[in-house]
Swiss-Prot record:
GO cellular component term, pick one: plasma membrane
Lineage, highest ranks first: Eukaryota, Metazoa, Chordata, Craniata, Vertebrata
Name of the gene this protein is made from: Ly6d
SMART domains: LU (SM00134)
A Pfam family of this chain: Toxin_TOLIP
Location(s) in or outside the cell: Cell membrane
Protein name in the entry: Lymphocyte antigen 6D
Topology versus the membrane: Lipid-anchor; GPI-anchor
Function noted in UniProt: May act as a specification marker at earliest stage specification of lymphocytes between B- and T-cell development. Marks the earliest stage of B-cell specification.
Length: 127
């Protein structure tokens, strides 16, 4: 009797459908908590952050069949570049964001413009 139950249990597990990965899927920063079931051959949740100093970071989240993460330090991502982060558990891309926040980059741009304007003012006064 125990053997029959064991065989039934093994058959039930072997024939049950595999659980698909669930990821947040969105195309912009405004709607980035949107859980969806990924296709069966997609094994990664992928977050791609485009660094845009004037518009802030643009975030895209999706299911992916392959993914390679980029690693960067805060403040070392140049404007116009993208940072990719990957994970492999359900809804793991909910909180993944770029290591270079848009506000920090915007502050750097503002500081650079202020410095340039100051130098131009000093040069104009010296002439």
């Amino acid at each position: 009797m125990k053997t029959a139950l064991l065989v039934l249990l093994v058959l039930a597990v072997a024939t049950s459908p595999a659980w698909a990965l669930r990821c947040h899927v969105c195309t912009n920063s405004a709607n980035c908590k949107n859980p969806q079931v990924c296709p069966s051959n997609f094994y990664f949740c992928k977050t791609v952050t485009s660094v845009e100093p004037l518009n802030g970071n643009l975030v895209r989240k999706e299911c992916a069949n392959s993914c390679t993460s980029d690693y960067s330090q805060q403040g070392h991502v140049s404007s116009g570049s993208e940072v990719t982060q990957c994970c492999q558990t359900d809804l793991c891309n909910e909180r993944l964001v770029s290591a270079a926040p848009g506000h920090a980059l915007l502050s750097s741009v503002t500081l650079g413009l202020a410095t340039s304007l100051s130098l131009l003012t000093v040069m104009a006064l010296c002439l």
